[in-house]
Amino acid sequence: MENLNVYKDLIKRMLTMVDAGVTDSAPAAYRQPSSVYTDPALFAREKATIFKDEPQLVCFSSDLPEKGSYFTFDDLDVPVLLTRDNDGKVHAFLNACTHRAARLKEGCGKTASLSCPYHNWGFDLKGKLRAVWEEKSFGAIDKSLYDLVRLPVEEKYGMIFAGMHPDVKVSVDEILGHMAPVFEMWDLGATRFVDQHEWKLKTNWKLALDTFCEGYHFLALHKKTLGGISIGNTSAFDTFGPEGRNHRLAFPNESIKRLKEIPEAEWGMDIFNDFQLVHFVYPNISLLVSPVSIEFFKLYPGENPGEHRTVFRSYVRSTNDEKGWDGNDPQAHFEFICKVVDEEDWVSANVMKNLNAGMINFSTFGANEPALQNMHKAFLRGIGTTPEEAPLGKVGAVASC
């Protein structure tokens, strides 16, 4: 794999940390008001800006595997329909007929054209209105005025990003910044979908996302899963994209120590068994990437601050259908990841209940949790509030401890 040398350097960084008993760190610990998880006004601003005004990573190229493919989702109260036309180009539309706003498609599949199930108006895969049943009833209709509502979309490096309204700017290279060549080497489109699971929990979407952003909890919370293979409280942290709002975390496994006895020239693809690689793509995506499997998490706000939905889609590379990185088949690996997330979401739900009690005024992110600090500062900037304007950053006695 072309990116093997990139990750050899990452391995060497982690080995240095493991030997020294340290981790990549922020300059200091950081206190965040609990209201960022519970305040309805802040929650409404997040939905209106962070989600509606920012491009979203919605799926992989392999979810539209051939000409005529379509893929639908309705994750942010905006029903979206993706198509791949006969030239191979991806389009994004509001999943609504322009006659009377009926939904055009459900799920995913393949089709030669789009026909409205309500009154049989017909559109091509580029969103052009081509047929009106009983057209004489509409007089001299100008079909060009009834093309599907187009949404911005870009496909690159095997990923598809889209905007939830027509004015959103989508530039994959701008989103990924200097990490774009690394994602290009991963070629996430060369994958096969395995399975999907959804969680709907009584917790804030950011609380659920927090668990992807530090390894400090591995040994305590995941004793029977990740804790059995991981080196806790150690990670290599890097930022990328606009204002460094995205990040990559590499968590070493205990097995990484074996590489100290093996010459670097002999390191091969099996080094990817020695660490876990997690990417956060603003505002709500966590990607666990390896040469064998990709775990794609999308986290969405619910109807109020204390509700959220996590969508987990698991993929394997088309050339590695038999075994996952942990030696299991793809379905068994999918079920293992679901078990890990179950352990985390239980904690997120009880934390939310405690925060709603109104007596824990701050959450504290240690210096050993730089990704959490970086991500939450980005969220504040995203709603027009800089961290310097909020009562954050000074560490003292935590309320109610």
State where each predicted segment sits.
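Short linear motifs in intrinsically disordered
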Residues: 58-66, 142-143, 274-279, 313-315
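Rieske [2Fe-2S] iron-sulfur-binding domain
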Residues: 63-166, 170-181
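Short low-complexity stretches enriched in small and charged residues
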Residues: 9-13, 35-39, 46, 115-121, ...
